[in-house]
From Swiss-Prot:
The gene is nfrA. Its cofactor is FMN. It holds the Pfam family Nitroreductase. Disulfide bonds: none annotated. This is NADPH-dependent oxidoreductase.
Amino acid sequence: MSDYVYNLVKKHHSVRKFKNKPLSEDVVKKLVEAGQSASTSSFLQAYSIIGIDDEKIKENLREVSGQPYVVENGYLFIFVIDYYRHHLVDQHAETDMENAYGSTEGLLVGAIDAALVAENIAVTAEDMGYGIVFLGSLRNDVERVREILDLPDYVFPVFGMAVGEPADDENGAAKPRLPFDHVFHHNKYHADKETQYAQMADYDQTISEYYDQRTNGNRKETWSQQIEMFLGNKARLDMLEQLQKSGLIQR
């Protein structure tokens, strides 16, 4: 049994600095085809991928994201929940399918489909020697992204992905993940608070030491402190409104 794929995914880390080398059309096609091979719920294929190489569009999206690598990359992918095709089928159907694709379950199916496709693309890109970084920051202004990309109803931008050749060999490193015993529950969920607190304390120490070493002492925050800062910042509170404007979560 080969550990090639295991070792590949274990090395994953976000890359935020890329060489100024655009991906070829052949590479883009292969990445998309790899993404399409991902599992999809009930064969709905409730997603689409928008490829961006137009510099003006990239710049407009950078203004939403606030991140330079939205522009400075080899290629930019945008992943969307897409029920527009299903809506067109619905126009000639005898049943009202919108009850399904306009539901909360429909949202989950589309989001999961898009994520599975994107992960396939990410792993394939890394196998080719490229680096990637996911871009949830495009949800900072969903309405503006929908305008930039001319998205119809029943299509919702979930996240993006910048891909390209890493600018150097030291362009990031894999962060220590939560230990195996923290995330793997055998047969049932184990919610004992004392055990959870002890595990988090150990992990907080690991993360603090990681940042301390990586930044020569400039950062020492724990994982818990990061979570408090991120989840305590009440951002993107308009998601439900934006989803409903797109024709999703109507029930």
